[in-house]
């Protein structure tokens, strides 16, 4: 089960059909990573800087907004609740401009990034970052989205 909650109405303007798009990307991740068979629960909250600032402060002790926060709940098993993914509308919009990528592409990237975090992937250590980025880039490529870690040629 995938549940998407819209905390901030601006998401509709930013990405069109945010619930449909988010569910599609999460389903895609579950399928590509061969996790669909477990029928896990994943919750996505499309929020804003204010909520992510509050959560980041409360749970990580970092007093600034961030693009995505993930909270992992249970290990992968049949019917498990994998966790929650929170995205900030303002961060996604601003970062897509800074990186010169389509908002929708960056939105998809951050959903994939959050999904990998709730599956236990991390990027704190160089080896972990290489593994996680390779998965992200591979999944994004299958969605027709270029590698976000390689600067765009001008």
UniProtKB/Swiss-Prot annotation:
InterPro entries annotated for this entry?
MetalPrtase_cat_dom_sf_prd, YbeY, YbeY_CS
GO CC terms in record: cytoplasm
The biological process GO terms on file are: rRNA processing
Residues given in the record as Zn(2+) binding sites = 113, 117, 123
Stored PROSITE patterns: UPF0054
Q: What is its EC number?
A: 3.1.-.-
**Keywords for this entry?**
Cytoplasm, Endonuclease, Hydrolase, Metal-binding, Nuclease, Ribosome biogenesis, rRNA processing, Zinc
| Highest taxon above the source species | Bacteria
Key word Hydrolase present:
yes
Transit peptide found in the keyword field: no
Q: Where in the cell is it found?
A: Cytoplasm
What note does UniProt attach to the cofactor annotation? Binds 1 zinc ion.
Supply one GO molecular-function term: metalloendopeptidase activity
| Co-factor(s) | Zn(2+)
Tell me which Pfam families the record gives: YbeY
State where it is primarily located: cytoplasm
Q: What does this protein do?
A: Single strand-specific metallo-endoribonuclease involved in late-stage 70S ribosome quality control and in maturation of the 3' terminus of the 16S rRNA.
Q: Which family does the entry's similarity section mention?
A: Belongs to the endoribonuclease YbeY family.
PANTHER family on file? ENDORIBONUCLEASE YBEY, CHLOROPLASTIC (PTHR46986:SF1)
**What protein name is recorded for this chain?**
Endoribonuclease YbeY
In the UniProt record, the gene name given for this protein reads ybeY
């Amino acid at each position: 089960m995938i549940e998407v909650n819209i905390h901030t109405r601006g998401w509709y303007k930013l990405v069109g059909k945010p619930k449909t798009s988010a569910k599609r990307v999460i389903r895609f991740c579950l399928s590509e990573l061969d996790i669909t068979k477990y029928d896990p629960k994943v919750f996505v909250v499309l929020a804003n800087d204010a909520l992510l600032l509050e959560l980041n402060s409360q749970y990580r002790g970092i007093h600034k907004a961030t693009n995505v926060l993930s909270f992992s709940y249970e290990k992968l098993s049949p019917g498990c609740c994998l966790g929650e993914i929170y995205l900030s509308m303002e961060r996604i919009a601003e970062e897509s401009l800074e990186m010169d990528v389509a908002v929708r592409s960056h939105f998809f990237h951050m959903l994939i990034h959050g999904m990998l975090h709730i599956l236990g992937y991390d990027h704190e250590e160089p080896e972990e970052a290489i593994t996680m980025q390779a998965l992200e880039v591979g999944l994004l490529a299958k969605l027709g989205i270029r590698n976000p870690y390689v600067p765009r040629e001008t």
